[in-house]
Amino acid sequence: MIKATYSSAKDFYSLLSGLLKVTDEIILNFTEDSIFSRYLTDDKVLMVIFKIPKEYLEDYTIDKPLGIKININDLKKILGKAKSKSATVTLEETEAGLKVTVRDEKTGTRSNIYIKGEKTSIDQLTEPKVNLSVTFTTDGDVLKDIARDLSLVGEEVEISADENTVTLSTEEAGRTYKSLLKQDKPLKSLNVESPSKAVYSIEVLKDVFKVTSISQNVTVGFGNNIPMKIEVPTDSGGQLIFWIAPRL
C-alpha cells in the first residue's frame, strides 16, 4: 500500500493546475525516490513533468513502485478548498484508486475524497538528453509578461544569448518586439557556455509561462536548435519541468 503526505496542499494544487494546461489525465508514479508524472503531447512539441522528491514528503510509505492513472479535475475539487498555507494533503492507495485528505493543521478541519484510478506500471517516458549551453533564472512573472507581449506580435520567438545578454525577439507583418535580459536586469543568474540561438512556438511558450508565475525562481535552459528546459520549483519542494521542442 502507498501513503504520502505533502506539506502544502496549496502548492500541490498549483502544480496540478500547471499539468492541466497540457492534459486532464495523468499517471501518478509512486517510486522509492519520488512521486512524479510525465506527459508528452501527441505532436511531441511539449513535455511536462510533475515531481515531488521523497525528502519533501512526510510519512512516505510504499510497498512497491506503482502508477495510478487519475483525472486531474477530480483531485482539484478537493485541493481547491485548501486556501490556508498550513493545509497538508495526504494520498493513500485504495482498491479503486486513491483516497485524498486535505487537513488544515491550524484549525484541525479535514476533507476527504475518494478518486477512481487505474493502477498501472511506472511510465517509461524519458527526458531529452541535451547539453543546455545557456541557463538563466528569473521571477516567473517576468516570463509570463514577456510571453504575453510576444504573442501580440508574432507566432514564433527567437531566443539567443551571448556572454551577458539573453534576447527574445519576434517579427511579423512589419511589427517587431524584442526583450533584453541581463544579470540583475532582471535575471537572478546567467550562465553562457557558448553563444546560442533557437526558435520556439510563442503559443506553446505562452501556455508554459502562464504557469511560471507560481515561482519566483524559474530556471530556463536552451542551446542551438535543441529543446528548451523550464524548471518551476515551489517553496515546499515540488516542481514542474517543461521541455519545449524547437522549430527547425
Swiss-Prot record:
Any GO MF annotation of the entry: DNA polymerase processivity factor activity
Matches recorded under CDD domains: PCNA
Keyword DNA-binding: yes
Pfam families: PCNA_C, PCNA_N
GO BP: leading strand elongation; regulation of DNA replication
Highest taxon above the source species: Archaea
UniProt keyword terms in alphabetical order: DNA replication, DNA-binding
Functional note: Sliding clamp subunit that acts as a moving platform for DNA processing. Responsible for tethering the catalytic subunit of DNA polymerase and other proteins to DNA during high-speed replication. Both trimeric complexes inhibit DNA ligase and both 3'-5' and 5'-3' activity of Hel308 (Hjm) helicase, but stimulate Hjc, the Holliday junction cleavage enzyme.
HAMAP family assigned to the protein according to its UniProt record, in alphabetical order: DNApol_clamp_arch
Subunit structure: The subunits circularize to form a toroid; DNA passes through its center. Replication factor C (RFC) is required to load the toroid on the DNA. Forms a dimeric complex with PCNA3 and trimeric complexes PCNA123 and PCNA323; does not form homotrimers. Crystal structures show a heterotetramer of 2 PCNA2 and 2 PCNA3, which would be large enough to clamp a Holliday junction.
Family: Belongs to the PCNA family.
Listed name of the protein: DNA polymerase sliding clamp 2
Organism: Sulfurisphaera tokodaii (strain DSM 16993 / JCM 10545 / NBRC 100140 / 7)
